[in-house]
């Protein structure tokens, strides 16, 4: 086990696991053991296969691409799983933030989704 793994762990969703692996290698650690599955109805299931109790957890999950909503839901469900697993801090690393273009109202009755 690497020394950094005692303090923090890096996990990834399905949006860009290659980027997460590169970040982990740069920081001298490995990716945490988690599996993100989909049920037949499309719902997301996150399974954390290691203890993160008391550790800082970084979730690398861009929210871009053809499945913006799916990527956001993966991130939220993973964050909830880590909270329930007693992680010390949960930090979302979002290299591209989907919905960022919706940062102001252009018309009436329109949401500001980026806030």
Map each language-model feature to its residues.
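PRPP-associated nucleotide enzymes
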Residues: 1-115
């Amino acid at each position: 086990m690497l020394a950094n793994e005692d303090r923090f762990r890096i996990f990834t969703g399905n949006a860009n696991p290659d980027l997460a692996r590169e970040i982990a290698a740069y920081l001298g650690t490995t990716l945490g053991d988690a599996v993100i599955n989909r049920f037949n109805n499309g719902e997301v299931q996150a399974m954390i296969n290691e203890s993160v109790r008391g550790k800082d957890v970084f979730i690398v999950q861009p929210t871009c691409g053809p499945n913006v909503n799916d990527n956001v839901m993966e991130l939220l469900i993973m964050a909830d799983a880590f909270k329930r697993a007693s992680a010390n801090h949960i930090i979302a690393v979002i290299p591209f933030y989907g919905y960022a273009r919706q940062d102001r109202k252009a018309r009436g009755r329109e949401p500001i989704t980026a806030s």
